[in-house]
Amino acid sequence: MKIFSLLILSLKITFLLTLLLGGLYPLAVFIVGKIFFPYQSEGSLIKDATGNVIGSALIGQKFDSPWYFHSRPSASDYDGLSSGGSNLAPSSLALIDTLRERTLRYRKENALSPTTPVPSDAVCASASGLDPHISFENGLLQVPRVAHERKADPKSIEELLRKHTEAPTWGILGERVVNVLLLNLELDKRYPKKIGY
């Protein structure tokens, strides 16, 4: 008889917790999100003037045209369905070759001298492969290339970069970063790239 009562009690607790944690709590979070955080609860989507979704402020995109600031490399080619890192060990020869190749390409694209330090986020993919940010230092090294390609004053491009720079969380966690999608959208508004330019 005692086992039967314990079984009934277990089933009641399981049902109650399933209802509470599997139904009421998610519903409450959904309602609070929709009311108080509508932009974030929809995925921080960025739309153009016609309402078409361009991307998300939370997910990186690939920019490889010389007139754009370039994002971090991605092991998953910015595919949200297969996000992740390369999972190569630091001692992996494949990783070392990839980093060497990316460093050479970054130096060439940005006309850097062999002694100019290359920021790690310019050649290393993030763990998710979807990071929307680059470091401020990475952005600074790309300013001359972007300014040249857009026929703009490098100082005005740098000002735009500084405007889009986010400070470390609480002033101490992390480093200054720049959301590449938001920065490139602002570039297109201020310095449109004409076809055949």
Curated annotation (Swiss-Prot):
InterPro entries: KdpC. The system is composed of three essential subunits: KdpA, KdpB and KdpC. Keywords: ATP-binding, Cell inner membrane, Cell membrane, Ion transport, Membrane, Nucleotide-binding, Potassium, Potassium transport, Transmembrane, Transmembrane helix, Transport. It is a single-pass membrane protein. It comes from the Bacteria. This is Potassium-transporting ATPase KdpC subunit. Pfam families: KdpC (PF02669). The keyword Transferase does not apply. GO terms for molecular function: ATP binding; P-type potassium transmembrane transporter activity. Its main location: membrane.
